[in-house]
C-alpha cells in the first residue's frame, strides 16, 4: 500500500549479469522523477541494490536452474528511498548482524558488507518460497 506522495516503480529483471545494467538504468529513470533526492542518497541506495542483485545472480540459483525470477520494487517518499528485491532462488543462509568486511587480501565477500554499510536498513526474509531483501535509505538534505 502506497503512502500519499509515494512514487513506486516495480519491474522484472533477468537473473543474469546483464540485469545489473538494467537495474542501474531503471534507477536512473526513477531518480529523474524527483531531483530533490540527494546525490549521496542516490549513490547509497544504488550501491546497495547493485551489490544485492549481484549476490542474487551469483548465489541464489544452481548453475543450471531454470525459471529464475527477480522482481525489483523501488519507492520513495519525502522521508526515505527504498528497494525491495525478491527472487525465487535458494534461501540465503545469512545472519545480517554478523556481516563484516573481509580481510583486505580476500578476493570476494565484500558485496553484502558494502550493502549493509551503505544504507540505513537491510532486512532479509523468506516469504512464500521467495527471498526478499528490503533496503531502506533515510533521505538526507544536501
What are the residue ranges of the model-derived segments?
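Glycine-rich/acidic phosphate-handling loop/turn and adjacent ATP-lid/helix
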Residues: 79-108
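Short, highly conserved beta-strand within the GHKL-type HATPase_c fold
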Residues: 73, 79-84, 132-134
